[in-house]
């Protein structure tokens, strides 16, 4: 079985693993990795099939979590952004003893809209899957543009994301498709009611992919978790609000 690309920096006494979102790679954390590595032992990861983690096909969420866990420290704070939030959540569910705290960023336990549940319309996700086979670079770029829409620094933030994608070879179409399939089908709302570790959920008020309406619904469903909304952020608050973002993580570190 292949290993994934994994880079460790910093020498803090708490380990922090960062998992990126769909179509991207660990380069997305460039704006905060220096600051975080002064507080944590930081682990930057390319998810299987993305970035420098080549040689993987489409994986289920459970398989992706197991592949990532193989190279992970014994115990860490796990932070996942968007699709990465589902991977981190899956690890917290299956190996809670390895997770000091769970942090999800602009992530939903169920990305797809369902009855009485706000999310991305299933036909929009299916449309992205269809367009991947026609022109996948343009499809990925459209998805990135959606992530920063509405913020004061939208254009600049979208450029930062695009630069991250273009810095490395594009993932294979079946890997991208597999990631969208996870976003379309996975629902962890009920399982995550029972996670035993500290659980922090971070959101952008202007996020077009994870509607802010889910925040109070999850506050009620998961009373043991904490939520925080970045008032002027969209889907990538760590790019638009890096200082505020790092401050929240350093504060969490004091509590675990």
Curated annotation (Swiss-Prot):
GO process terms (BP): biotin biosynthetic process
GO molecular function, one term: pimelyl-[acyl-carrier protein] methyl ester esterase activity
Pfam families xref list: Abhydrolase_1
Amino-acid positions noted as binding substrate in the UniProt annotation, renumbered to this chain: 22, 82-83, 143-147, 235
Gene Ontology terms: cellular component: cytoplasm
Assembly notes: Monomer.
Protein name in UniProt: Pimeloyl-[acyl-carrier protein] methyl ester esterase
Native organism: Escherichia coli O81 (strain ED1a)
Taxonomic classification: Bacteria, Pseudomonadati, Pseudomonadota, Gammaproteobacteria, Enterobacterales
């Amino acid at each position: 079985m292949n290993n994934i690309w994994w880079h460790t920096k910093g020498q803090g006494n708490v380990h922090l693993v960062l998992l990126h979102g769909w179509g991207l790679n660990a380069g997305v954390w460039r704006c905060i990795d220096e600051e975080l590595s002064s507080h944590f032992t930081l682990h930057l990861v390319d998810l299987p099939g993305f970035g420098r983690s080549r040689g993987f096909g489409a994986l289920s969420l459970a398989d992706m979590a197991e592949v990532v866990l193989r190279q992970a420290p014994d115990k860490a704070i796990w932070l996942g952004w968007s699709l990465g939030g589902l991977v981190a959540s899956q690890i917290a569910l299956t190996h809670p003893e390895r997770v000091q705290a769970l942090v999800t960023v602009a992530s939903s336990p169920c990305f797809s809209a369902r009855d009485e549940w706000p999310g991305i319309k299933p036909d929009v996700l299916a449309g992205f899957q269809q367009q991947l086979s026609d022109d996948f670079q343009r499809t990925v770029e459209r998805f990135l543009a959606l992530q920063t829409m509405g913020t004061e620094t939208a254009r600049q933030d979208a450029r930062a994301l695009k630069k991250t994608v273009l810095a490395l070879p594009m993932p294979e179409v079946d890997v991208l498709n597999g990631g969208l399939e996870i976003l379309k089908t996975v629902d962890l709302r009920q399982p995550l009611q029972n996670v035993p570790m500290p659980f922090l959920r971070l959101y952008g008020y202007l996020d077009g992919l994870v509607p802010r309406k889910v925040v109070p619904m999850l506050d009620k469903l998961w009373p043991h978790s904490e939520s925080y909304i970045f008032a002027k952020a969209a889907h990538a608050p760590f790019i638009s609000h890096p200082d505020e973002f790092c401050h929240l993580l350093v504060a969490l570190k004091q509590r675990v």
